[in-house]
């Protein structure tokens, strides 16, 4: 079953140069947006008609395989999200390494955008901490949905069988192939979501 996943460790992307491509919105007043690639020396946070920013590593999209992670809340059909817990992060060096990688990637994006300590809250992190810090942090992951097909664009296996995303229940243990989405500007804030391609339910 391990062959079902791409089995790309996050260390493959550690300390590698990321490439960013800026796409501008041709007419922000239109409901159906069109975007054009634009080389620029300006900090993206200062571009008023910024549409999105593509991210690659060595010209390839960033897709990696997570460690085994607990999904505390199961699949959330309302927002099509999975919450993956960095379980036992204080004692598990592999989990801590994965957390540091995700956090480092977000910091790299913030620096590229041109955000400072004063404007850092304009970047919407996908790492979630509870306010009292009683629990391990979580990573928010999106399950892509194709509206024209009315279906989820994800492959899921459990015990050698394909299953639906609704089979991911509270506290399921998962290993996932996730990939990074573009940095989007939304309501004057910036968000870069992780999306899931393959899920192995353990």
Annotated model-derived regions:
Residues 132-201:
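Extended serine/threonine-enriched, polar tracts that run as long, contiguous segments within proteins
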